[in-house]
A protein has these predicted regions:
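Hydrophobic alpha-helical positions that pack around
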Residues: 1
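Glycine-rich active-site loops that engage anionic ligands at enzyme catalytic sites
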Residues: 7, 11-122
Length: 122
């Protein structure tokens, strides 16, 4: 059951390490309209370290070994955009409407799996 969304990862070293660490499952933490969860063993190469994120961004916070998914305002937001508590490395983006995650605000766990890229036929 639950909500299923797809995300596309960027071609960065941090994103590749996250992909290799999958599948990952664990307790889901909520901070405003941000979900975050531990994904241990990933080195943060900080290619895109920033506090500027958009709704739908998937980011890694190396200091906490945490993957974050932004789907709305956070407690630090001044406007409509989410604001992370610290600099994060944007590693990907939700495909479709990230606001769908609002339906999972009471979820206790999250599972992130790999979807293998489509292989060309022929």
């Amino acid at each position: 059951g639950g909500i299923k969304l797809e995300a596309e990862l960027k071609g960065t070293r941090t994103a590749e390490e996250i992909y290799r660490a999958l599948p990952a499952e664990g307790p889901l933490n909520v901070w405003g309209e941000e979900f975050y969860f531990k994904i241990p063993g990933v080195k943060d190469h900080r290619e895109t370290a920033t506090t500027q994120v958009k709704i739908g961004d998937v980011a890694f916070w190396g200091a906490g070994q945490v993957l974050a998914i932004f789907f709305g305002r956070t407690p630090m937001s001044m406007g409509a955009d989410p604001v992370p508590a610290d600099r994060v490395n944007v590693v990907g983006r939700v495909v479709g409407d990230a606001a769908t995650l609002r339906q999972a605000m009471n979820a206790s766990t999250i599972r992130v799996e790999r979807i293998e890229p489509a292989q060309p036929v022929g």
